[in-house]
């Protein structure tokens, strides 16, 4: 349950940061239609836009986050041990950037497999590590021990093994 609330909270945070970056939309007195779920192609295009410069492109995340949440075409399981960094105090922009990268990479890997599979935590962390490098480049003092450890594992071509070890250490939520 804690993981679900964390995911909803971060999605709200990403949406809020995105809304701050966009001008307010004009409103009318008519009823609004239910939002359309983005297609896989729209979600992947948004993912690529975000991925090009993740720290400054949070405004591009909504289509792929909506697709993940509403399409039913991907399934992402949030692992408390792998995402423990989410509970550490840090700038909300960094947290949203890393989390969106994790979700987007996971989504893209599942769509590339052309079928709904289990969560692809390795692809998610690979993308989160790319975003982490972008954050660190802009803010060299920012550091997360788990990401440093996983970056080292990636350099040594052991990322899949390291992620699997973290995944297997996870304890199920109460």
What is the role of each PLM region?
Residues 4-13:
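Sec-dependent N-terminal signal peptides
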Residues 15-19:
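Sec/Tat signal peptide C-region and signal peptidase I cleavage site
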Residues 20-66:
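Immediate post-signal-peptide N-terminus of mature secreted/exported proteins
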Residues 56-173:
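Mature extracellular/secreted ectodomains of secretory-pathway proteins
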């Amino acid at each position: 349950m804690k993981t679900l609330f964390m995911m909803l909270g971060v999605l709200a945070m990403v949406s809020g940061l995105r809304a701050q970056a966009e001008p307010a939309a004009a409103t009318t007195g008519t009823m609004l239609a239910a939002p359309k779920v983005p297609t896989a192609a729209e979600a992947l295009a948004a993912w690529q836009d975000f991925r090009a410069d993740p720290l400054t492109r949070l405004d591009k995340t909504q289509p792929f986050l909506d697709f993940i949440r509403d399409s039913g075409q991907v399934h992402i399981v949030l692992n408390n041990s792998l995402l423990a960094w989410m509970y550490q105090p840090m700038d909300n922009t960094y947290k949203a950037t890393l989390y969106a990268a994790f979700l987007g990479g996971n989504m893209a890997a599942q769509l590339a497999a052309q079928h709904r599979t289990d969560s692809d935590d390795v692809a998610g962390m690979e993308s989160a590590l790319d975003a982490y490098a972008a954050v660190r480049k802009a803010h060299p003092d920012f550091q997360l021990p788990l990401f440093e450890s996983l970056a080292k594992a990636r350099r040594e071509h052991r990322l899949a093994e390291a992620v699997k070890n973290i995944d297997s250490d996870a304890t199920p939520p109460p």
